Amino acid sequence: MEEKKKEEVTEDKIFRALRKQLLATPYSAPLHYNLGLAYARREQLDESITCFQQAIVYDPKLVEAYINLGGIYLRKGNLEACIEANQKALEIDPNHPLAHSNLGFALIQEGKLDEGMAGYQKALEIDPNQAAVRTNLGGAYFQKGDLESAIRENLKALDLNPSFALAHNNLLHAYRAKGDLEAAKTHCEKATELGFQVNPEIAKELGCR
């Protein structure tokens, strides 16, 4: 608890320092960008959007501002604006893996499964060592009914991060759908051990502790 209070005090000091610096240099894209990040951490999303937009005004090539702007729009449920922001990021840097993976995620939320998977695949082509993206791609394969590919991608995610609870949960569902209940139980227990809230009915069915 004491450590958390110290972090909050430090965060507040940084926030106030950024605002003070911005008064002195109001046309600084990095300051607007960093203040946008600070507002996002404080859950002040509208203010965060304004700061990222101002950062883009002063530096139209600041790709990270577009990506973070897209992330805020996603948190607000504005998928169209999220997609547009990440597409603009990719116009600046076509090989930015985070922009591709974020775009893929938003497209899947819109129901565009194949387009979203293409975004994940492009992100992994650029940087194969992204456990979260492999897990998301595995989840998309599961939605398509391709269980072997779903299992493959989630196992690759665990190669990168053996403690990735979501990958274990995804594998429990893929193995269960495949009929391999022993493997499903193993991953159910691992996901639970790592703190993931596994579906209680499925956990009971598998005898998962």
Model-derived features: positions:
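N-terminal segments that cap or nucleate solenoid repeat domains
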Residues: 2-38
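Structural signature of tandem alpha-helical TPR/SEL1-like repeats
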Residues: 6-20, 42-54, 75-88, 109-122, ...
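Conserved alpha-helical positions within TPR/SEL1-like repeat arrays
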Residues: 30-41, 64-75, 98-109, 132-142, ...
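Boundary/linker segments of alpha-helical solenoid repeat arrays
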Residues: 64, 97-98, 131-132, 165-166, ...
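Alpha-helical protein-protein interaction modules
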Residues: 176, 181-188, 198-202, 206-209
